[in-house]
């Protein structure tokens, strides 16, 4: 595209002209000769019917921040409102899917307070830290953005379907994959470069050693972005990856100000750091979406299509309903129930 100036000129180039450029291998030339735009036009029609926006590097609203990364996406499909990322303090929040309740609460509260201070939150829409980060931003009445590893309408992780709907109405769902494109173990690591590429910095809340969230960190480092980490107990395996990042030079944080002070002089019109220096505290209860995640069977993965099941208490007796409500997602002593 850089050689031809734009995508249109690339697509209209004849096979002979393309061969003379020396840009493509023999295999790529064979694919180019057999290429048609019929599938592309079909995707455009489908996006129009679904109400998705299509953004390419030729568009003025394609983030310059994203265009500067190695291998930027050639296209973004968007459901919702796509902001001017270059004029916003966008912060990525990542972490393990099988996180602790403490990790969920920290992610939720940190995202809420970052949003209240003027930042926008970007994550991956997955279970665990991702979902809690999105929920925190939504609770603050702000915008949040989920970068998916599949087509926007693909039935991925149905347990988070309602959360994705809320995100599309208060932010946007973003993907480089066209409608109906399935999720796989390959698509998620690839999309992580977009999560970090849209943002000024990436926050790791909880990460075991080998966590997929560390792939996002690798991309962020390659892109020259900041890395922030919530420190954890040195004996806690859920923080093994996190603490290793701190050892290697990442910024340990305990308040939203630890993050936002890095950008306040560049975005004073966006940020309000009043109260941001207070430590992260949490006392709010998990949402129903988060409770649903907790009771999800272990065999369900992000690629599964298990329908969301909510507990109906209307058929229970008053005593049974009271007993049910006394239980918690964490351990409960029998003496606390009676």
Region annotations inferred by a language model:
Residues 1-60:
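Short, small/acidic-rich helices and loops at N termini and domain boundaries
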Residues 42, 56-338:
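Glycine-biased, small-residue-rich flexible motifs in mid-sequence functional cores and linkers
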